[in-house]
From Swiss-Prot:
Transmembrane annotation, as ranges: 179-199
Cellular component, GO annotation: membrane
Region spans: Disordered: 122-157
Glycosylation sites: N114, N134
Upper taxonomic lineage: Eukaryota, Amoebozoa, Evosea, Eumycetozoa, Dictyostelia
Protein known as: Putative uncharacterized transmembrane protein DDB_G0281897
Superkingdom classification of source: Eukaryota
């Protein structure tokens, strides 16, 4: 019986350790699993630079992502930042359901490429008057995303906790991930403690 319990505890601990390592790895590293090798890098698009790749981990404030396809290229923006020219810093926050709107997709992709918003090609959703980026330097908030320009204020840079990692970019810490790791560590400790008590008795 002790041997069976020992084997059971060992298996549980191995699974918990693997989950711990997997969570940490997936949270901090871009990994391409979609068959687009060109996506596993930082991709320059005309004047704009996007972070491209696939991020695992389900970060609480960056869990949604947009993927743009242009020929064989795949561009991903994860509720983060991209750069237009060397001085302008732009931030977007998107809703996931917009990914199903192909016409809006194309309009927004055009904005990414040209760093300009073409209102005549913008579909009704989102409305150009309500939600189009304010290129004059202010901020425009609509039902679907938030745009802010650094030409009026640099405070918005702190709105989305981001930092670069391995040249690709990562989007802060996830409280849920930290809780999960703490729980895994606690379970590992408790199971080992019970194993020691069980063997000694």
């Amino acid at each position: 019986m002790k041997i069976l319990y020992f084997i059971f505890v060992i298996i549980i601990n191995i699974l918990l350790i693997l989950n711990h390592v997997k969570s940490k790895y997936n949270t901090f590293i871009f990994e391409n699993t979609d068959g687009f090798p060109e996506c596993n890098r930082e991709v320059p698009i005309d004047k704009c630079t996007l972070f491209c790749g696939r991020l695992f981990g389900g970060l609480s404030y960056d869990s949604e992502k947009l993927i743009f396809y242009e020929g064989e290229n795949c561009y991903t923006m994860i509720h983060g930042e991209f750069l237009c020219s060397d001085t302008e810093r732009t931030s977007f926050r998107m809703d996931n359901y917009l990914a199903d709107d192909e016409s809006w997709y194309k309009a927004f992709f055009n904005y990414l490429v040209n760093c300009t918003w073409d209102e005549k090609n913008t579909p009704e959703t989102p409305s150009p008057t309500e939600n189009a980026p304010n290129t004059s330097g202010g901020s425009s908030e609509g039902n679907h995303y938030t745009y802010k320009s650094s030409s009026s204020s640099s405070e918005h840079i702190n709105d989305i906790p981001t930092y670069s990692h391995s040249g690709y970019g990562n989007y802060g810490e996830d409280p849920q991930r930290n809780i999960g790791i703490s729980l895994s560590s606690s379970l590992i400790f408790i199971s080992i403690l019970f194993l020691i008590i069980f063997i000694n008795n």
